[in-house]
């Protein structure tokens, strides 16, 4: 398993995608992944995650965009040096793709909103012949 990490505006985002064989049904074109996300606040300020925007791109180039408030029903406040972790999931109709995106955060001290990029990461299943990503 490969972890993907990217730091933007003093916020480090690490993603670990995991293919879920038990929930996938390849003969019905349903491939399922979970992904563990770790968000570390490396800034000196307290920040709050306001929203998320994801792009899920399958290996054929089909793009699905998802946006919403917070993550997993929360808008966590993350103090300087602290880490927030969560797990979520997605599915594709093909055996591989890529996810990427961004979070919108509020700096609670300056009252400024800023973006943090989510590293692009591969969604690969054992049903692909070669690793395209």
UniProtKB/Swiss-Prot annotation:
PANTHER family: F-BOX ONLY PROTEIN 3, POLYMERASE DELTA-INTERACTING PROTEIN 2. This is Protein ApaG. It comes from Wolbachia sp. subsp. Drosophila simulans (strain wRi). Residues 5-130 form the ApaG domain. GO terms for biological process: error-free translesion synthesis. It holds the Pfam family DUF525. It comes from the Bacteria. InterPro entries: ApaG_domain, ApaG_sf, Uncharacterised_ApaG.
């Amino acid at each position: 398993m490969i972890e993907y990490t990217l730091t933007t505006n003093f916020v480090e985002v690490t993603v670990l995608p995991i293919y879920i064989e038990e929930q996938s049904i390849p003969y019905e074109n349903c491939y399922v992944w979970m992904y563990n996300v770790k968000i570390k606040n490396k800034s000196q300020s307290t920040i709050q995650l306001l929203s998320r925007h994801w792009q899920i791109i399958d290996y054929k180039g089909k793009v699905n965009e998802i946006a919403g408030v917070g993550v997993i029903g929360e808008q966590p406040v993350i103090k300087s040096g602290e880490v927030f972790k969560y797990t979520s999931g997605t599915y594709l109709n093909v055996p591989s793709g890529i996810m990427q995106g961004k979070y919108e955060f509020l700096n609670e001290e300056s009252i400024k909103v800023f973006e943090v990029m989510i590293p692009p990461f591969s969604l690969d299943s054992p049903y692909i012949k070669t690793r395209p990503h």
